[in-house]
Amino acid sequence: MNLKKTENALSLTLKNFIKSESFGGIFLFLNAVLAMVVANSFLKESYFALWHTPFGFQVGDFFIGFSLHNWIDDVLMALFFLMIGLEIKRELLFGELSSFKKASFPVIAAIGGMIAPGLIYFFLNANTPSQHGFGIPMATDIAFALGVIMLLGKRVPTALKVFLITLAVADDLGAIVVIALFYTTNLKFAWLLGALGVVLVLAILNRLNIRSLIPYLLLGVLLWFCVHQSGIHATIAAVVLAFMIPVKIPKDSKNVELLELGKRYAETSSGVLLTKEQQEILHSIEEKASALQSPLERLEHFLAPISGYFIMPLFAFANAGVSVDSSINLEVDKVLLGVILGLCLGKPLGIFLITFISEKLKITARPKGIGWWHILGAGLLAGIGFTMSMFISNLAFTSEHKDAMEVAKIAILLGSLISGIIGALYLFALDKRAALKK
């Protein structure tokens, strides 16, 4: 009965999110595999040269642009972080993070799932040039994790899906904080003040409930540039922009007009093809329905497929390719061990222990419909770090520490693969065990 209530509580938005993210995760995985194959084939020189190709335009003696790799990591990934920011804002206002009672359990789980992997990595790499990579195993890739859960289907309780999504959203928020605090260097305060000025204008637009997305996006480009120049990673600008996008629906609701249009359409005669009148009515319905959506919903709906089926797969293809040959030094400090143990051991232990202790201390309450063994299974799947871990590895290790970056990427792929396989087998066995007991 509790599971039925939980399933009914799962909003349509959340269900669509599960679907898009899970299929996006499969596509993401295929691109990561393709990158590894190409990076270790006769095409490897062309593959690595491609990402250093400059793209932009020349103005006199000045070149305005970036390498293809920077376009992906700094510009396209900003759109991905914009979508993450929109998701976080929605969950904070209306979703599973909207109240302390709802949010406390997954948020504490996310904190434990970030601290434990970070500590394991740092302990193994303390006092080495690679210690700065402690943020790498802290992240969870929700697309991959949900892809695994969707493959398991009904064997996974709906309540566990909700918990994992909420945990991943809180984890994303934590990763953003980690990037802002620990992977920011050489701050330029003049540019930072410029960014704050843009944020102030965005806040005024939000306060006035300006519903057109155009001024927000134009100011967002300016904010991105200021933040990029300030020394803070530019993707943080996208998250700030997301929090400034209005979420209120219009007061002059179009419901009555939609009903009237629906009645008009029902009264028209049906044929093989739509008549001109029917096309006009449907076009009006589409416009009125769009007007009912908040700017946040419209932007999120627009970005979801672009992010899931273009930006993330392209990021995976550009970053997952590592040439594994005799020249690579797998013994760079303890990077390989730190990342793999952080993802495969630190994530499940951190999530399980901190939630178990917090419930015993009556700080939080476990969601109905899932047991402690389910929480451990979610912890195993949370060890699939891939996308965000790859992103943080690019920030943690510069070109001067290329060996560590390459080893970290191999470790992320191995750790994520191990976590995904063990997590899937574990939840499958858990379901079988429950079925036998019945």
Swiss-Prot record:
Write down the chemical reaction(s) this protein catalyses. Na(+)(in) + 2 H(+)(out) = Na(+)(out) + 2 H(+)(in)
Q: One GO cellular component from the entry?
A: plasma membrane
The membrane topology term of the UniProt record is: Multi-pass membrane protein
- Does rRNA processing count among this protein's keywords? no
Compartments in which it is found: Cell inner membrane
Keyword list (alphabetical) reads: Antiport, Cell inner membrane, Cell membrane, Ion transport, Membrane, Sodium, Sodium transport, Transmembrane, Transmembrane helix, Transport
Q: Does the keyword Electron transport apply?
A: no
Could you tell me one molecular function GO term of this UniProt entry? sodium:proton antiporter activity
* UniProt cross-references to NCBIfam families, sorted A to Z: NhaA, PRK14856.1
Report the function annotation for this chain: Na(+)/H(+) antiporter that extrudes sodium in exchange for external protons.
Annotated PANTHER family: NA(+)_H(+) ANTIPORTER NHAA (PTHR30341:SF0), SODIUM ION/PROTON ANTIPORTER NHAA-RELATED (PTHR30341)
What name does the UniProt record give this protein? Na(+)/H(+) antiporter NhaA
